[in-house]
Amino acid sequence: MTYQSQLTELRGMIEKIEYYKYTTDALIYWDKITYMPRNAIEYRSKVMSFLAGEQYRLLSDSRFQKLIRFFNGNAQNVFVTNAMIRRLIRNSESIRAVPEAEYQKYVELIAVSEQVWAEAKEKNDFSCFR
């Protein structure tokens, strides 16, 4: 495969990762501005956990890792490509340091605790966080 075809493949993979991230962020934002019903939090947190799992699998995919290694320090890279690769290495290493199931549970916990925090703040009662 040529340099350009591999770069195109990598960009396609990054695009998918960004779609999942954007969807997760949009879901959180939409729920905030529409004041999502209290009992909908469980479903939302499961959706967010699923999206996080998909992101995790893409970032830790063996082909994705192979492409990152190929571009890391490649003499044909322009400045922007080098910066992109540095960020991808940092992101993929940090996410792969945590097992996938644990990462998904973490995202689910964050989704639930965000709403609990908002309610606790409104009532000025943070005992539920002890």
Functional labels for PLM-detected ranges:
Residues 2-130:
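A well-structured
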